[in-house]
Structure formats: structure tokens, C-alpha cells
Amino acid sequence: MNVQVINKSKHPLPAYATELSAGMDIRANLSEPITLAPLQRCLVPTGIYIALPQGFEAQVRPRSGLAIKKGITVLNSPGTIDADYRGEVCIILVNLSSEPFVIEDGERIAQMVIARHEQAVWQEVEVLDETERGAGGFGHTGRG
């Protein structure tokens, strides 16, 4: 699939790290480093603008290494970029650790997954069909 992209950063386009990767690493595009204090959040620019085909979205997800090693994650995970959005792709990061974290220019801060989606059409009914699970949720099926 081809996706139109404008790269206003000085960094490479988002790229797959391996042949079978689902997500492309996306980089911070900063004029100076950002220091994220514990529990602080910020909007990080990437310098990337995309035009997705109709029926697709881009999901912005955390990078597992940053999450486990540094406590840095995408706050609205997954963030959704709609096919009709034409602004700069920016990433909302939060520092969940107890230590400050410095985001450097060019650092891989998140991953982007391109996915198909459908738009639902609501069908109002009076009663939903029965299932084995029923209304059970929030830990209903076992521990955790």
C-alpha cells in the first residue's frame, strides 16, 4: 500500500525495524531536547504529515523498550490518525517513572501501525441476543 507523506524533519521516514514488523518507528523532531519530569506529559512533534487511503487509520503506540526501561509511554494509546487528517503527526508522551527523562532530537519515541477499519452503522434494538458470557466483565472470567 502506498501512503503519501511529507517529511519536514531532518530524520528518516518512519520505518519498519525488521521484515515482519507491524509497526514503524517514528522519531522526535526537536529544535532542542525536552526533559519530561516524572508524571509530566508533552506533545512531541515529528515533522511528518501523511494522507492515508480511505478505510485506513494509523495507530500510534508505545515502543516497548522505552516503556519497560524508562517508563515512557504514549498517553492516549493507541492514538488514532484518521484518513482525513492532514496536520503534523505529533505524539503525546508521558513519563510514568520516578526519574526525569530527556527526549532527544531524532529519538525513536513511538511506533505507527497502519490498519484497516470499518465504520459502524447503529441498529437500535430492544434486546440483545444471549451469550454464555452475558454481562460479565471487568475480571469476570478469572483472576486479574
From Swiss-Prot:
Cross-referenced Gene3D superfamilies: 2.70.40.10
Catalytic activity: dUTP + H2O = dUMP + diphosphate + H(+)
Protein name: Deoxyuridine 5'-triphosphate nucleotidohydrolase
EC number: 3.6.1.23
InterPro entries: dUTPase (IPR008181), dUTPase-like (IPR029054), dUTPase-like_sf (IPR036157), dUTPase_trimeric (IPR033704)
Pathway involvement of the protein, from the record: Pyrimidine metabolism; dUMP biosynthesis; dUMP from dCTP (dUTP route): step 2/2
One Pfam family cited in the UniProt record for this chain: dUTPase
Organism lineage string: Bacteria, Pseudomonadati, Bacteroidota, Bacteroidia, Bacteroidales
Job of this protein: This enzyme is involved in nucleotide metabolism: it produces dUMP, the immediate precursor of thymidine nucleotides and it decreases the intracellular concentration of dUTP so that uracil cannot be incorporated into DNA.
Gene name per UniProt: dut
Gene source species: Bacteroides thetaiotaomicron (strain ATCC 29148 / DSM 2079 / JCM 5827 / CCUG 10774 / NCTC 10582 / VPI-5482 / E50)
Superkingdom of origin: Bacteria
